[in-house]
Amino acid sequence: MKFALPLLLALFMVGCASTKKKPFAAQRMTVRTTAYTHTEAGGVNNAIGSRLRFGGDTFSAASDWSWLPLGTRFRMVENGRTYVIEDYGSALVGRKTIDLYVPSMGEVRKWGVRNVDIEILEWGSKAMSLKLLKPRATRDYIQTMVAELQKTVPPSALAAATL
């Protein structure tokens, strides 16, 4: 009986001990990329109303949000730059293409179309993507993204989504 209390205490401590989480293993993939600039239709702001970014520690990118949702962060292997998905475009829907923001049409032409390796650093939010897109679903390409997102986003997640 005198060993019961220390044994119970030891079992309790082992049961409550936290396990170390394994470090996030970045998912690597090869993707088709194109480039766009602010002199095209969308202007200097991205889909969430912030300025498009080029330089610094994060660069702006666009995708089909039903594939790579808003907020997805990735690193391009060839140049080490970190990008965040914060925009979308009609030419991207259903094409598994990432459009990289660059500051000029000259840079758009220079980039062209390239297949590059990326590492996903953090997945964005499909629920937040859906929440932002639903009120904008007056165009076919946005309706397509909304329909795809609705297949995977439960209503409870949509209600809880915040930017």
Segments and roles (model prediction):
Residues 1-5:
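Positively charged n-region of N-terminal signal peptides that target proteins for export
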